[in-house]
Amino acid sequence: MCTAATYQTRGFYMGRTLDYEFSYGEEIVITPRRFPIALRHGGVMDTHYAIIGTAHVADGFPLYYDAVNEKGLGMAGLNFVGSAQYAEVVPDRENIAQFEFIPRLLGRCATLAEAREALRTLNLTGTPFSERLPASQLHWLLADKSGAVVIESVADGLKVYDDPAGVLTNNPPFPQQMFALNNFMHLSPKQPENLFSDALPLTLYSRGMGALGLPGDLSSASRFVRAAFTRLHSVSGEGEADSVGQFFHILGAVEQQNGCCEVRPGEYERTIYTSCWNADRGIYYYTTYTNRRISAVELRREDLDAAALIRYPMRTREDIFYQNAPGTES
């Protein structure tokens, strides 16, 4: 399962957790402007906006999990198993396979408004990448500094929903997730008053009691509520370090620890990586399950007019700083 979120301070930030029981060998992948993106149902995007994000590169093609383009439009795909239904190929339509959905939108659209227009005419198909890599059942969070939408391809068509909560998890479908927030309208970061009865001398015995009832389990419905509550009440400084640090704390509220979510006997879902990007500056930050230090790759330090993918392996070895090591300044 996964969780994605947006966050606005002086800059605009977005990112996600990838929660799964195994890795496909994810990398930080930059698709420069002149890398040819061959579309499965015809046509090649010879030139496009530069993109940075996490992807599995298969047969030279970047299968993006999440990414942001040089203009500040970002997108993340999250599991939507059992609910996602894609269209069949339709002649005389722009047919886009789900695995090329992220590079198609981010490669051609500079803003959320432009992406909304593109979605009016796209036909999203379930064409598999290969026999080894069938179509993933996904829905997507798409956002820039102007707002966020959720895209779901379901039995009755492609749906685009405004997302005022600024978060997305997995099932159930997004309208149900938003409706369920009504059950938690009493939650608050403030300490509660005794509204139970004037006849009872009820007292506060702990801090944080305003959020009693906030779900704490790992289900996607509970993570949606917890991520929304945490994001909407987060407070941080406006600077880069404060903003990035707070974003990782927001997603830290829903990260999964190895051993707590068994998917098969002896196999456990865990947060393989957490990402955060500064959409304005094109900086992609991440941590991994086995390296909690924040690493970063900056889009604009590369040759964005190149024609080959630029790839950085994720850092997965724990990096511990010894403050009292000889010659070390704390």
Regions found by a protein language model. Give the residues of each.
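Short, surface-exposed beta-strand-loop junctions and turns on beta-sheet-rich folds
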Residues: 20-22, 81-83, 156-159, 166, ...
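Broad, structure-driven detector of short, well-ordered beta-strand segments within folded domains
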Residues: 28, 68, 149-153, 159, ...
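Proteins synthesized as precursors that undergo proteolytic processing into mature forms
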Residues: 92-128, 240-248
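A contiguous strand-loop segment
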Residues: 1-94, 126, 313, 323-328
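C-terminus-biased signal that marks the final domain/tail of proteins
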Residues: 1-13, 127-130, 135-136, 145-147, ...
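Catalytic cofactor-binding cores of redox enzymes
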Residues: 121-159
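Short, flexible loop/turn elements at secondary-structure junctions
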Residues: 18, 79, 144-146, 155, ...
